[in-house]
């Protein structure tokens, strides 16, 4: 990986829905663009460049794709991650914003497992795609630069996993360099962390020896409740080496931003959760592999 442009492939995993996983992917992607200048060297023009990010949506709910403007209804005939996975064809990437590309999900992914199970190594379908030439679906920006591989075209790949330890999630683990686990500080959301860490260990032993846990991110935190403080203490004691210093708080501004079809940094960058995701983005940047 050191000889390519790509710095990290991050898989965002939690087998419970509604824990801020997709929101975290959206916010990190836009945060990397907003705060990443100065971390990624200089372009051909000699200027410091911002990172280019690829989002891979593996969630049949298609939420990440929707947040970045993918229209499921009017895009039925356009190739998605689903098509690439079952046919092992180049991953279709669509430019959604300046510097942010999307390999969109499809609701058909809810029934993808029988197709994947027909493959020689079902858990490596996505990993193989990331090593293939990409399929640029809009414009020729990447082709004009003379790059056609994901490793050379992007600085970051962010994978949004379904809220289950499914075959799609294991595909993400086999393809990723690291795992980010967004954790809401409540009983049902925290009890599955051990299952995720065990899945990481299993994948590391069988398919991806370089896979690591990038960190646990506390999301939608409320320090004013006793229960939240107790769960913070639990995470610190049990997973201290893996807990990010940054965390995010509940804030209605995030709901408003997404309802308006935009991200928190565009809508309200100085609100509480905007500042929280700024800190998280900078923590990722400052600990980025070189």
Predicted regions and their residues:
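P-loop NTP-binding core
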Residues: 1-290
């Amino acid at each position: 990986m050191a000889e390519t442009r790509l710095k990290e492939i991050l898989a965002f995993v939690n087998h419970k829905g509604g824990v801020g996983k997709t929101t975290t992917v959206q916010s990190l992607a836009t945060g990397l663009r907003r705060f990443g200048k100065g971390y990624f060297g200089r372009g051909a023009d000699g200027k410091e460049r911002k990172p280019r990010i690829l989002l891979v949506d593996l969630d049949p709910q298609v939420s990440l794709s929707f947040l970045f403007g993918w229209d499921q209804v009017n895009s039925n005939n356009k190739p998605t991650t689903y098509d690439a996975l079952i046919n092992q064809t180049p991953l279709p990437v669509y430019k959604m914003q300046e510097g942010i590309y999307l390999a969109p999900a499809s609701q058909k992914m809810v029934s993808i497992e029988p197709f994947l199970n027909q493959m020689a190594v079902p858990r490596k379908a996505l990993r193989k795609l990331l090593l293939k030439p990409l399929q640029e679906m809009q414009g020729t920006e990447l082709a004009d630069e003379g790059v056609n591989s994901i490793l050379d075209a992007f600085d970051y790949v962010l994978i949004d996993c379904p809220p289950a330890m499914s075959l799609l999630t294991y595909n993400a683990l086999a393809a990723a360099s690291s795992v980010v686990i967004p954790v809401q500080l409540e009983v049902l959301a925290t009890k599955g962390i051990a299952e995720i860490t065990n899945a990481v260990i299993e994948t590391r032993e069988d398919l991806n020896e370089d896979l690591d846990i990038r960190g646990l991110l506390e999301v939608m935190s409320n320090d004013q409740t006793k229960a939240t403080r107790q769960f913070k203490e639990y995470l610190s004691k049990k997973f201290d080496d893996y807990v990010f210093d940054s965390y995010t708080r509940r804030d209605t501004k995030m709901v408003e931003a997404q309802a308006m079809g935009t991200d928190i940094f565009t809508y309200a960058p100085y609100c509480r959760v905007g500042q929280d995701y700024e800190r998280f983005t900078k923590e990722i940047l400052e600990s980025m592999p070189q």
